[in-house]
Every structure is written in C-alpha cells, then in structure tokens.
UniProtKB/Swiss-Prot annotation:
Location of the region described as Disordered in the Swiss-Prot/TrEMBL record: 48-78
Gene3D superfamilies linked to this entry: 3.30.70.260, 6.10.250.640
Protein's cellular compartments: Endoplasmic reticulum
Origin organism lineage: Eukaryota, Metazoa, Ecdysozoa, Arthropoda, Hexapoda
Protein name per UniProt: LDLR chaperone boca
Organism: Drosophila melanogaster
Name of the gene: boca
Keywords on record: Chaperone, Endoplasmic reticulum, Signal, Wnt signaling pathway
Length: 180
C-alpha cells in the first residue's frame, strides 16, 4: 500500500512542478478568457508553443520560406531569357494556362486535358490539372522547370490553342491564327 502511495506521489510530482506560472505571476494577457484573445495574444501563444521546437529542415519548410537555390549562370546562353527563367523556377511551384481550340464543352475540354496530363505523367512530368473555363485549364507544376518541357509537348498537340507561362503566350502548332 505504501509503495502505491509513493509511486502515485512520484507520478504526480512532475505535473505539479511543470506548471510554468503561478496564478499571481501570470501576465495580464494570460488571465483573459480565450474568447477575448487578440491577434497579438494568439501570436504570443504560438511563439511560446514553438519556442522549444527544433527548426524544420529546408525541404519541410513552406515554399515561401525555403532558401533560394543558387543559380549557375555560367552554363546559360545569355541570349535566351527563357533559359534563365527556367533555371530560376527550379524547385518552385509554377502555374500555366492551357487553352483548347474550337468551342468545346467543359466535359470535352476536361477529357482532352486529362489525356494531356496522363501523357505528361507518363513522361515523368508531374502536373496537377484544374479546369477554370470551358476551354481553359491550369496545369500546376511543383518543379517549375518541368513547365517548359510540358509546354514543348502541349503546343504540339492537335487541340492545343496555346500555353501561357509567366504571362508569355506560346501558340499551339495546330491553332489557327486569329484574324483581326
């Protein structure tokens, strides 16, 4: 019986000693009801929560907090700004717009772009596809350099009207020119 009591006391001791503040020593913001917390209070609470955590590895950080990869400009052709753009997007998420020719229904465009997406996957180019209009889709690439390889494939397709990367339009080979 005494050993149980001693074990119980030993188990409860860390819980009692682990309390960070005594009631009278708490800061004013910590005495508030949680429903009355301001953004600054919540930010302070988050900082306390994360103060003892180890920093995340570079690949675990959100994309906007990751360090920029070093660009090797010695291998680039200075006459091609496209190559510079391609290298600068390595490891970064990039969205491209892809348009389908003609006046297709949403289902028809969905089928065509799904076929293109599967062809890209078969070529080891990872792209997510989102339909944004009846004849337009967004292809999202986790590695931005793959977007230019995908562009080369897509503009060769029979029903591709054009691909837009970084506000630059690349017309499809089989797309008819719009006459003014």
């Amino acid at each position: 019986m005494q050993t149980r009591l001693v074990l119980l006391l030993l188990a409860l001791t860390p819980l009692v000693l682990a309390k960070k503040f005594k009631e009278e020593e708490k800061p004013a913001w910590a005495k508030k009801d949680i429903r009355d917390y301001s953004e600054a209070d919540l930010e302070r609470l988050l900082d306390q929560w994360e103060e003892d955590e180890e920093p995340l590895e570079d690949d675990e950080l959100p994309e906007h907090l990751r360090p920029q990869p070093k660009l090797d400009l010695s291998n680039l052709d200075s006459k091609s700004p496209e190559d510079l753009l391609k290298v600068s997007k390595k490891g970064r998420t990039l969205m491209t717009f892809v348009s389908v020719t003609g006046n297709p229904t949403r289902e028809e465009s969905d089928t065509i772009t799904k076929l293109w997406q599967t062809s890209l996957w078969n070529n080891h180019i990872q792209a997510e596809r989102y339909m944004v209009d009846d004849n337009r889709a967004i292809f999202l690439f986790k590695d931005g350099t793959q977007a230019w390889d995908a562009k080369d494939f897509l503009i060769e397709q029979e029903r591709c009207k054009g691909v837009t990367i970084e506000n630059k339009e690349y017309p499809g080979v089989n797309a008819k020119k719009d006459e003014l």
